[in-house]
């Protein structure tokens, strides 16, 4: 039996490509419904992290409860769940969408549909959400709302004839959006008498309350004092507080089927309350969990080391604190001959890695060195044993390897048709396999490629943007593994292997990559008192060499005229000294060297 109250609840999220105005629209909705006054408003209210505001991106999911009074005096409860728009956080998006019945699709009237818009839109359609298209930025002179409406109808196949035309910046027609949500988004179905089922769509650590779980109650009710069980981990807790977000926390007595809110239950670690897990009652558990849960799988690995070795403990503490709030971050200790003690960290993708590094440097004031990112390679040894390699230094000897496999991703790139040539060339250079291309309209194309993940994690995105003057957009997802001919490229300085610079590269690229790195390091490594050979090697075979010349003191300065044999003696003596120095000398490697390894010249 659906209660009257339930019929007046709407759960929705906002999906959009980066920079199409998602967080600004959320701000306007909060303002229009009087949830926050103008005075409390602040740009991007739901993006609470400094980093989110600075980069203008949303990283964590957030939620807010809006009370909307229609003209017929009925009050509606609208639960807005803000989702991240970036491809690294795809799983977070899918969990937030699973907590909703509808989604507002924001499309920029000047840019039209982009890759991420499509990807998130298909995610929403998979969850059977009602999609409400909204066209934003119509106050700009270059807006073309009618064309964009046609695009939405042609590509996604949803009716956009009565899509509200709004400007989130100036607050134009915001009321139409609220009306559309009430009209089009279905109310939540779910019985209050059934056993409890609630979906965790985000969790966050609070120093006083422990872990705060953001939940959407699908069936049943939950109140303080209920003993709950988490279905993925099997752990049991007692609920200490339930409430809703007005974006701040507001305590209420309980949550019923269809509600979105938070619960706390003295949970100590975010890992115990994983995003996507199902909460049920310990006494009367649900028979099966809500579908779609999967643990977050790191795709990209990188070593993080403190610049000052003594700060190892502080770095560990920083990572543990970040992990409390970010279940997708994984790390384990490792040592490197060149860099000392540090951690091998796993991330969802490059943006995630970048954000974690920046947060370590910012929030914990630590100077860190990061090594080149790498992916998980599956190595099958000659004795049929299979191992996963995330760090090139752990790769077995060449003679022990039967074959290696690397992860492949499916990429869809949306670009203006003028840039198809350069972009196809870029994908070809990155060992991409062309699948197909479709014209969205006469001027825009979707290109589908399968590309090895390790070709994307360096600087594919930058290269894509520069080839298309910033117009192309990219979306990718992991497809599986494929067998490839790969070798380990080592860098030797002064005859010593620098383990932190090792990398796994495709065999046919080893020579050019080695050549590039040797030349790059020659520019970066400062000249020493002795000459330093830089060698790139595969196995025991050196494939490229550069030499950093020695600095020399003018030992003949005080000889004037003088006898040639005297000069010879001094020069020989200098040569001897340099030789001895080279045997005992060690070379300082500047931080840029580790970073420059990543930038491959196209």
From Swiss-Prot:
Identify the PANTHER family for this entry.
TRANSLATION FACTOR GUF1 HOMOLOG, CHLOROPLASTIC, TRANSLATION FACTOR GUF1-RELATED
One GO BP annotation here?
A: positive regulation of translation
Major site of localization recorded for this protein: membrane
Q: Which PROSITE patterns match?
A: G_TR_1 (PS00301), G_TR_2 (PS51722)
Q: What is this protein called?
A: Elongation factor 4
Q: Which gene encodes it?
A: lepA
Q: List the disulfide bonds.
A: none
**Cellular compartments annotated:** Cell membrane
Summary of the function given for this chain in its UniProt record: Required for accurate and efficient protein synthesis under certain stress conditions. May act as a fidelity factor of the translation reaction, by catalyzing a one-codon backward translocation of tRNAs on improperly translocated ribosomes. Back-translocation proceeds from a post-translocation (POST) complex to a pre-translocation (PRE) complex, thus giving elongation factor G a second chance to translocate the tRNAs correctly. Binds to ribosomes in a GTP-dependent manner.
A molecular function GO annotation? ribosome binding
Q: Which Pfam families match?
A: EFG_C, GTP_EFTU, GTP_EFTU_D2, LepA_C
Binding residues annotated for GTP, in chain numbering: 19-24, 136-139
Reaction(s) catalyzed by this protein?
Answer: GTP + H2O = GDP + phosphate + H(+)
Residue span(s) of domain tr-type G: 7-189
């Amino acid at each position: 039996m659906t209660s009257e109250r339930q019929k007046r609840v709407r759960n929705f999220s906002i999906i959009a490509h980066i920079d199409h105005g998602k967080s600004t629209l959320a701000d306007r909705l909060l303002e229009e419904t009087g949830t926050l006054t103008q005075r409390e408003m602040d740009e991007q209210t739901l993006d609470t992290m400094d980093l989110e505001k600075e980069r203008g991106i949303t990283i964590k999911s957030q939620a807010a409860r809006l009370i909307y009074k229609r003209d017929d005096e009925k009050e509606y409860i609208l639960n807005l769940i803000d989702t991240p728009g970036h491809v690294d956080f795809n799983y977070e998006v899918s969990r937030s969408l699973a907590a909703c019945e509808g989604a507002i699709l924001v499309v920029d009237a000047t840019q039209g549909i982009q890759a991420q818009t499509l990807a998130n839109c298909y995610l929403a359609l998979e969850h059977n959400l009602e999609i409400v298209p909204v066209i934003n930025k119509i106050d700009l002179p270059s807006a073309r709302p009618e064309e964009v409406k046609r695009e939405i109808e042609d590509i996604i196949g949803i009716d956009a004839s009565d899509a509200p035309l709004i400007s989130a910046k100036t607050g134009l027609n915001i009321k139409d959006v609220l009306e559309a949500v009430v009209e089009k988004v279905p109310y939540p179905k779910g019985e209050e008498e059934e056993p409890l089922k609630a979906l965790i769509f985000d969790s966050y650590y609070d120093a006083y309350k422990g872990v705060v779980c953001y939940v959407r109650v699908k069936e049943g009710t939950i109140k303080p004092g209920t003993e709950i069980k988490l279905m993925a981990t099997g752990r049991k807790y007692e609920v200490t507080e339930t409430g809703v977000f007005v974006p701040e926390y507001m305590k209420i007595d309980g949550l019923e089927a269809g509600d979105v809110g938070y619960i706390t239950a003295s949970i100590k670690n975010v890992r115990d309350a994983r995003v996507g897990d199902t909460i049920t009652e310990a006494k009367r558990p649900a028979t099966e969990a809500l579908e779609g849960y999967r643990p977050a799988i790191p795709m990209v690995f990188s070593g993080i080391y403190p610049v000052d070795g003594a700060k190892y403990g502080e770095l560990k503490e920083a990572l543990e604190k970040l992990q409390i709030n970010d279940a997708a971050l994984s790390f384990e200790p490792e040592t490197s001959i060149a860099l000392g003690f540090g951690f091998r960290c796993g991330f969802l993708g490059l943006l995630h890695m970048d954000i974690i590094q920046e947060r370590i440097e910012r929030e914990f004031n630590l100077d860190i060195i990061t090594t080149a990112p790498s992916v998980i390679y599956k190595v099958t040894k000659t004795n049929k044993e299979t191992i996963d390699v995330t760090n090139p230094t752990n790769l077995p000897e060449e003679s022990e390897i039967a074959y290696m496999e690397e992860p492949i991703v499916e990429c869809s790139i949306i670009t203006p048709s003028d840039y198809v040539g350069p972009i196809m060339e870029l994908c070809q250079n990155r060992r991409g396999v062309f699948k197909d291309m479709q014209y969205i309209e006469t001027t825009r194309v979707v290109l589908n490629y399968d590309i090895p993940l390790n070709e994307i994690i360096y600087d594919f995105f930058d290269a894509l943007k520069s080839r298309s003057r910033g117009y192309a957009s990219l979306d990718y997802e992991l497809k599986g593994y494929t067998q490839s001919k790969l070798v380990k490229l080592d860098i030797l300085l002064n005859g010593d292997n620098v383990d932190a610079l090792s990398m796994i590269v495709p065999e046919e690229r080893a020579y050019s990559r080695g050549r590039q790195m040797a030349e790059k390091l020659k520019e970066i490594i400062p000249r020493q008192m002795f000459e330093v050979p830089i060698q790139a090697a595969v196995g025991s075979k050196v494939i490229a060499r550069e030499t950093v010349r020695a600095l020399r003191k003018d030992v003949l300065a005080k000889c004037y005229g003088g006898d040639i044999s005297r000069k010879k003696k001094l020069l020989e003596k200098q040569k001897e000294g340099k030789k001895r120095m080279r045997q005992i000398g060690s070379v300082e490697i500047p931080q840029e060297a580790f970073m420059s390894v990543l930038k491959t010249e196209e």
